[in-house]
A protein has these predicted regions:
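Active-site neighborhoods and metal-handling regions in enzymes and metal-associated proteins
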Residues: 1-372
Length: 372
């Protein structure tokens, strides 16, 4: 915050709150509400405004916890409640000696924004500071990723063992969730389990479809693991023992793409250089490639990521003017599926950037049958 000349921040993003305070309450619900927030001065300890019913939970961790104001369910009275909240923000800034300073905010709805305007509190963007703070992992975070890497390997092992003809996609998703929760993971934030034709194009979530003999079965774990840190690895399995030549080809394309990105991971390489040197998919697979080749991971799917430099589909993605740094955590991913084909392959590795190159967070192996 000091680097960006931000004296004080108001944080509503659940991952930012957890990073600043170490607390997390009912993450799925609070992520979609404005029920809890914190004020973080550049100098001094954060003040957590907790959902009123959960104040006792956070007081075990944070010294200064106060009941949160919320207007979200106030109907026609919401604007008045938001003004009351804005006055409390003004009072807290005055208490901190920061009443006349700019307030850096991560997210807010229109009602809250207008209420702060009414109080003449100047608002600026906090994103550059939170990205820089969370991008390079601390030694404690690196240890948590090591713990979660082992959890990721275990849950994928149970998932693979459950694949059989007749099991439904949503049942496989349940296997993944159960395996995660039994190891003190916190939950899955997508349902990306699919089989057969549902693997092409990618991003079809779990359905009632039964897995058939010879199907490819794809999974992206997309999991909040122990202490909320991301377990994000993709694998594609075969239901059976005899892949077709076409299945092997798609698997090899995705595998070689991810392995080629491994070779580029080192501190100091710019995002632009990485994107320029990364493997290109064969033309037959390019139309349905994954939107980005790399994203970051922490307490959530994090950015900035690395897009394909030649992507002309839809709004052009920004190529961040950044470089890889030691102790960043990256997810290197590739989808290989031809348009109209009855299958596709999604592979993704999660790696820690070290001075010697990438270190796997999850070491779950690739399928030797599909690589043969």
């Amino acid at each position: 915050m000091k680097r960006y000349d931000l004296p004080v921040a108001l944080l509503y993003n659940t991952a930012n709150i957890r990073y600043a305070t170490g607390t997390d309450v009912m993450v799925v619900w609070t992520a979609g509400t404005f029920a809890r927030y914190c004020i973080v001065p550049a100098e001094g300890a954060p003040i957590l405004f907790e959902y009123k019913g959960s104040v006792h939970v956070s007081r075990k961790i944070v010294d200064d916890v106060r009941p949160a104001y919320t207007w979200q369910y106030g109907g026609l009275a919401a604007r008045g409640k938001a003004r009351e909240w804005a006055r409390s923000i003004r009072d807290t800034l005055r208490e901190l000696g920061l009443e006349r300073e700019r307030l850096a905010v991560d997210k807010l709805d229109a009602t809250g924004f207008l209420a702060l305007q009414d109080e003449q509190i100047p608002i600026v963007e906090v994103l550059p500071a939170t990205v820089d703070a969370r991008e390079v992992k601390t030694p404690e975070e690196v240890q948590l990723f090591a713990i979660n890497g082992a959890i990721g390997d275990a849950i994928l092992g149970e998932f693979e063992a459950a694949i059989r003809p007749g099991i439904r996609e949503f049942e496989l998703h349940a296997v993944l969730s159960d395996a995660l929760l039994r190891r003190r993971g916190e939950g899955l934030f997508t349902r990306l389990v699919c089989s057969g034709a549902n693997t092409n194009p990618w991003l079809t979530e779990a359905t009632e479809k039964m897995v058939a003999p010879g199907d490819l079965v794809g999974v992206d774990t997309d999991a909040y693991g122990y202490e909320g840190y991301l377990i994000d690895i993709s694998r594609t399995f075969l239901c059976g023992d005899d892949p077709t030549p076409e299945q092997r080809e798609a698997y090899r394309v995705a595998h070689d793409c991810v392995m080629g990105m491994h070779e580029l991971v080192k501190p100091g390489i710019s995002f632009e250089e990485f994107a320029r040197k990364a493997p290109r998919l064969p033309e037959a697979y390019a139309a349905q490639r994954y939107p980005t080749m790399v994203h970051q991971a922490g307490l959530e799917d994090e950015g900035p990521g690395i897009p394909y430099p030649d992507d002309t589909r839809g709004p052009r993605r920004i190529m961040p003017q950044r470089e890889l740094k030691e102790n960043m955590v990256l997810c290197l991913e590739c989808y290989a599926g031809k348009v109209g084909a009855p299958f596709g392959v999604k592979l993704e590795d999660q790696v820690l950037v070290t001075k010697d190159g990438p270190r796997l967070v999850c070491a779950f192996p690739y399928d030797p049958k599909l690589l043969a």
